[in-house]
Amino acid sequence: MDSHHGYPFMTPEERELNLLYDEAINVTGGFDVPKFPDEFVMEGQIVPVVFAHSEYMREIGSRYCKLAIETYNKQHNTNFQFTELIKWNAAALLNYITFKAIDQNSFGRPMKTFQAEIYDHPGKDELDQVEVEFCRLAPPDL
């Protein structure tokens, strides 16, 4: 029996999308992945978080970005300030966020794009539940 990469229940189109998804995960680390059809969900799948029309979700995303850039600033002795949430993908409690920030010490310099991986621990009190796994400058092609 041909397992079709472990998913015999997928249609040929879904298998093709799954291969593209796997490749995107390998290339981007979860920061840029194709969207599966809504009726098809895999355990652990990284999916886009819809934040554009939700003030609550924008606030959470902004909080994640501010914590991430604070971590970056401490690690690199810089003074970036979060300005804009660009993209947010998530798989359960793990968040892959792309955002822009500006260097407060460099007048007139363009904003830079960052990527952060954020883990939101369940059950901890509000101040301690979010952990910045890493924050880095995004690859130049973004």
Give the role of each language-model region.
Residues 1-56, 86-142:
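Compact beta-sheet-dominated globular domain cores
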Residues 50-80:
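Short, non-transmembrane alpha-helical segments in secretory-pathway proteins
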